[in-house]
Each structure stands twice: as C-alpha cells, then as structure tokens.
C-alpha cells in the first residue's frame, strides 16, 4: 500500500509587493489580510484547423497571460490606524497609467513548496466591494501580468 497524501490548503499562497519598485534591489512587503487568492495562467488559443484534419478542429497556443485575482479585507493597525502597507502600495497604483500603474510582485507557497514561486510586474485593478451594514470592507484586486512571470526560488523554502 502506498503512503497517503496530504491535502494542501488554498490559503497556502502568500503575496508580496516591492515597495521600492526595483527589479535589482526589491524591498518586499507582505500583502496581509488576503481573504481569497487565485493565481492564473490563461492560454490564448488560435484555430489552426485545416483540410487535412478530416473534419476535426485544431488549435495552437500562441500566448500566455498570467494574473492574480484576490479579495483583500481592509484591516488597520490598532496602534496607528494605518492600513496594511502591502495593500496601500497596490492601491496607490490602481488609478495610475504606465509604469506608475503597475507593481512588482512575487507570490509563492508559504509552506515552502519549491515549484510554486514566481515574480513579475502587473497592472492593478482595485474594486471596493461595498455591501450591507454587517459586511466587512473588502476589495477585489486584479493583478494582470505585464510580460512574463519568472520562476524564483521560494523565499519560504
């Protein structure tokens, strides 16, 4: 009988943002109070069906887009009243254009799995959720990759 496997939890992901905006000397700050996070790689497929396929379709992958969809819960310091520094850095880029509208991020398995660690530059979308009187203040964030994501050594390894 083989060794049983252990399930990993969705909350294993950690997201850091570079507050120095520097590929050569980044200053990483954890983005805290993540309620949900989904890293994605979406292929762009082009139809390359031809007469030789006997009526069957065919596609070729021509492009990859990466993104991170996250729900952030607004939490503040009980001492200073300041919002999380990682969230603040991302929010500061959401209504800017060009270089000012992107952030340098890395995301990885907080338990140290070696094959789940990446970094890249991303454009920011920031959408407050609103809600009823009993709702938490949450924000839906989309980080859409600008260029390739790069595999990195997991900082938690």
Predicted regions and their residues:
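Solvent-exposed edge beta-strands and adjacent loop segments
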Residues: 2-77, 121-137
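Short, acidic/charged, Gly/Pro-enriched secondary-structure junctions
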Residues: 82-118
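Compositionally biased, intrinsically disordered low-complexity segments
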Residues: 34-37, 93, 155-156
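Mixed-charge, glycine-accented linear interaction segment located at domain edges/termini
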Residues: 119-157
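Membrane-topology and secretion signals of cell-surface/extracellular proteins
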Residues: 26-28, 113-120, 151
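Short, cysteine-centered beta-strand-loop-beta hairpins and adjacent loop/turn segments enriched
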Residues: 75-81, 149-153
